[in-house]
């Protein structure tokens, strides 16, 4: 599906149907990750950048929420080895690059609000690929059960320092970086997983989401020449 076809499909499918709710993520966990990412940046010495992001946190979170509306959530999957997504939708790495470039364009136009909104949507994908189901291109198989469990326990896995910075100079590469790590944890969070295996996997993957989000935010601000 080319870019024009995908844009048309997003318009037609924006209203969604009940099925899309089964594969959409939980945006409140993303909001938690965004908040922690900003804290990490501040603790890591990027206080000015963290202060700017904090002022726009509500806007970033709205972008995160928008990214799951309708069928857009079906473009949140990416096998890190063959680079394919959940067919026929685009892969998450390409979608992240597209959103990031749009955010940067809006920034250069002077529209900071729209830029941070789109940055939130792009960061959503970096975070989603810390979930093994997204890296394995598996929409079900315990996906929603695991994400609901994380929603109820995310505070237990909060980190506040040591962001992961300078992964790559390509927005898509941030998605692929996380997907490669998450890939190996699928057996621990699939329908055969247990609360014990959930906890083990989440102790690695949720801090990864927070730390790479800090790096991704700083990467954007550096690209914006801040």
Residue spans for each PLM region:
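N-terminal, motif-rich segments that launch catalysis or mediate targeting to/interaction with membranes
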Residues: 1-109, 117, 135-226
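Short alpha-helix carrying the canonical HExxH Zn2+-binding catalytic motif
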Residues: 115-126
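Catalytic Zn2+-binding segment of zinc metalloproteases
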Residues: 126-138
